[in-house]
Each structure stands twice: as structure tokens, then as C-alpha cells.
Amino acid sequence: MKKSIFSKKLLVSFGSLVALAAIPLIAISCGQTDNNSSQSQQPGSGTTNTSGGTNSSGSTNGTAGTNSSGSTNGSGNGSNSETNTGNKTTSESNSGSSTGSQAGTTTNTGSGSNSESGMNSEKTENTQQSEAPGTNTGNKTTSESNSESGMNSEKTENTQQSEAPGTKTENTQHTS
């Protein structure tokens, strides 16, 4: 009689364990879903290049310009590339060119800043502007700041401007 009661209890306990173990397996198999998601990344994300706008990557190069005249013909292109190797070496190059012909009143305003931490840093800016004959009154204000911690620092700025005959009044301010 005791064996019979013990056997029934053992059988009931074993059956309960099997049932409890099967519930998660059933839930897993019923609730299993496959999530396949695809994302497309727009070209140029990570580094943003906009003419007359902002190039931003690990370090920040910012330029802002405003040109207003009676008639304006302009084209510009720019490229920005940066390579980081390890934690101590940073190599950055920024090149851009713009060509425009303008007649009338022109106002150019630009500001840029470059801040880096690395072994070598270099900043180069080239500006070219040609203007058609006429009366030109231009105000150009440029402010730049360059702060770096590293071993070598080089900054080069080239500005070229050619104009056809005419009357021109220009004020240029440069602060570093």
C-alpha cells in the first residue's frame, strides 16, 4: 500500500516536471519571430560636405558665407577627408575651390574654426574671386581660431582676387 502511494506521488511529480519543462519550449516555438530589417544609409553621412556650409567630422571645420549682388554667377566645390589612426595621430585635409563672377554690390562674411588633438595638423584655405567690370562695394570679415595640442602645427592661407577695371571699395578684417 505504501509503495502504491509513493509510486503515484513519484509519477505525478515526474509528470509535473515534464509538463513544466515543455511549456517554455512550446512558448519559444510559438513566439519565435524572425526580424530582418534593412537600413539604407545616405551617401555622405558621417562626414557632411556642403559648399558654403559646414564640414564636420572628428574635428570641426566651419565656413559660412553670404554673397549678394545684382547678378551672380558662381560655382563651387569642396572636399573634406579625415583619417584617424590610434588615439594620438590625426591627419586631416580640407580642400575647396570656388569661382564666381559678380557685378553690383557684394558682401562676403566668413568664419571658421579648427580644433584638433594629435601629432600633426594642417589647415589650408584657398579663396579665389573674379569680378566683371562695374561698381563694387564689398565688406569682408573673416575670423578664425585654431587651437591644437600636438607636436607640429601648420596653417596656410592663400587669397587671390582679380578684378576688371571699375570702381571698388573694400574693407577687410581678419582676426585670429
Swiss-Prot record:
Lipidation (N-palmitoyl cysteine): 30
Any one annotated GO CC term: plasma membrane
Membrane topology according to the record: Lipid-anchor
2.5 X 13 AA repeats: annotated segments: 123-176
Record lipid sites (S-diacylglycerol cysteine): 30
Polar residues: compositionally biased ranges: 126-142, 158-176
Main localisation: membrane
Annotated signal sequence range: 1-29
Repeat region (Sequence), residues: 123-135, 155-167, 168-176
Region (Disordered) residue spans: 33-176
Biased composition (Low complexity): 35-121, 143-153
Location(s) in or outside the cell: Cell membrane
Keywords carried by this UniProt record: Cell membrane, Lipoprotein, Membrane, Palmitate, Repeat, Signal
InterPro entries the UniProt entry points to: VlpA-F-like_signal, VlpA_N
The protein's role, per its UniProt record: Responsible for the antigenic diversity for host adaptation.
Note: The numbers of repeats can vary and is one of the basis of the antigenic diversity.
Protein name as catalogued: Variant surface antigen A
